[in-house]
Every structure is written in C-alpha cells, then in structure tokens.
Amino acid sequence: MVIDGKPHGPHKGVATCQTYMRSFSNGDEIVIEPWRAKAFPIVKDLVCDRKSFDRIQQAGGFISVRTGSAPDANSVPVPKENSDLAMDAAQCIGCGACVAACKNASAMLFVAAKVSHLGLVPQGQPERYKRVKAMVDQMDTEGFGACTVTGSCEAVCPKEISLDFIARMNRDYAVSLIQGDPKQVAGGGAG
C-alpha cells in the first residue's frame, strides 16, 4: 500500500505490515492507496492483483536441474561473497513497492533479485542464462515499464535490495542474448 504518497509509508526499510500506528501523531490524517501499475490491476478497495509477479517467478525463478541430495549440498563450496549477495537478493518479499515507486512501473528490481539469488550459487548455474531470459521476457509480457535506473525502487524497498542486482541481471541478460537458444542455432548459420 501507499501511505501518504510513499510506498510502505514514511519509514525506510519497513513494510506496511510492519508499520505501527504509533509512528503517526494523534489526529494525523493518513491517506492510504493501493499500488498503481498497469500490471497490478485493482481488485477492490486497497487490494491489487499481483499475480504478474507469480507468473514471472513461474517463468524461471526456480532450479529444476538435479543438483544433488541434501548431504551433497554441504560438499559444494560457495564463496562467502556470493553467499552474502545471494542472501541479500533472496530477502525480496515480492511486495511490489519497487513497481509502485517507479515512474515507469518497472519490475526490474524484483526480477533482478529473484534472478540473482539463484544465479549466484553453484546450484543455479546450469540454468542461469535461460532463467534470466525467461523471467525478463515474462516481465515484458506482463506489461511492466522499462527501467531508467532512477533508483526510486531501491529507495522504497523494505528489504533495501540494491540496484547493483539490476546491473548483474543486465549482464546475464546480455550473455543470454549472445548465447542464443541452442535449438535455434543448431543446423543454421553460414558454416
């Protein structure tokens, strides 16, 4: 929800559901609105439909290749920096504040967080580029706007997800475009 014109309200790093009424003065008039974005249609009152985020997640926000059983996970080394970054990205709660704050209603911060938290660990590597392509394509299909990197999304994110994840996702997306779809490349070309 938007409280007094700010996604999630007046406090940085705090979601609406964690905002206490005691943070407002007695007698204050508070204006509460739903998120406003084409991809988040209003259902009624303060309820908006965020199923577009679910469809983006379903497009590739998972690991489907066999990566070993539970004991095997302990034998796969994950560099500390990657582990920390993956955990930072995994904090995204998919609330939609990034979309609500963006002048273009872009979902890049959400998608970047979901792509990065899987792409930074060894288990996510086999599908890394396929995942980013599928999720960005689904984001575009859902009608979210283009990112112009103004940073308004980062400023209102209750989990303080960094814009750096968008840069990381853009690099992975560029690689996915260069690599192309192996099915389309096979048998073609000038060779």
Regions found by a protein language model. Give the residues of each.
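Ferredoxin-type iron-sulfur electron-transfer modules in oxidoreductases and energy-metabolism complexes
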Residues: I32-K38, I42-Q91, C95-G191
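A surface-exposed, charged beta-strand/loop segment in the N-terminal or early-internal portion
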Residues: K12-F40
